[in-house]
């Protein structure tokens, strides 16, 4: 493969893969949240949707299977079929019923399984010199998929009903399957040619600075995750329709997220991972205060739109830096297991923040809750100096691979 072709083909494939990854995650964390809010389900129950995120934490227990059985491509295809069936089921059963929760959990399991295979494949095919470009494409595509899930599905629902919207959404994984059938590389996981992935992970954990790295993974995006959980319920509480919320997220949100992801990826390339984590993390934290101001002053539509622009752009910045960091510290030979464990730890913080969000926002009110989300970002930022040496050591150890 020529260098020019490699520089556009690998990021393009990453964009397709991570759109497929982001869409079901957006359904679980954005669409269902909005759907139940529109259906007047209690705010605390809406927040509990976040507890389904425990599935992404538990995926570490089946990630070795994906590293050792079959190909990443096969796992991705199987997960896409399961995602389609689960999405259709969400449209058929009543909201917040037992069957609805079962379908939601099935969707999460299929999505988490797909995540493992996609992350491993992306790490395997991405050289260090393309980390910035791939993660720009990844964040932009992933967030765009979440916006389509949270906004596009809502717009469709206002026109044909939520049942029709979920069934229409079920077609998207099948479209992606058809694209990836021709585009995804046909390479095996090659598990028989390397050491036990769990043993390799234990070696990684025992390296100097590993505990600090894990703490940063757990805490770095805690504030942003807590904020996102209560954005759509707040918009609905202010009298916006599902279509209005969808228009904001699909139009303004998509443009700003993609711009933020591209800018974040360029920032990583120019300034390195450590400085990107620190500076873009601060920007991401401060963006939470836009919603705090709007809720505190009960500001009108222009301010609401402005808060959405600031949050989505800055979210793209911070996420690009964070995902580059996760990929950088993984061993490519055990990509599925290592990345699954690290992302599972990240999911612990996300699940905790989101599951409690409805209760905290219900008791404090939206304004105080948004101030709290900004404060939740501080511990992760404060820990960054403790991992600076570890990142430098990782860069040195990976140098021969360039």
Where are these regions (language model features)?
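Helix-loop boundary and gating motifs at the non-cytosolic
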Residues: 3-56, 211-216, 220, 224-234, ...
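C-terminal membrane-cytosol helix-exit motif in multi-pass small-molecule transporters
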Residues: 171-189, 383-388
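C-terminal ends and interior cores of transmembrane alpha-helices
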Residues: 77, 81-95, 282-299
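Helix-to-loop junctions at the C-terminal end of transmembrane segments
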Residues: 58-71, 259-276, 361-362
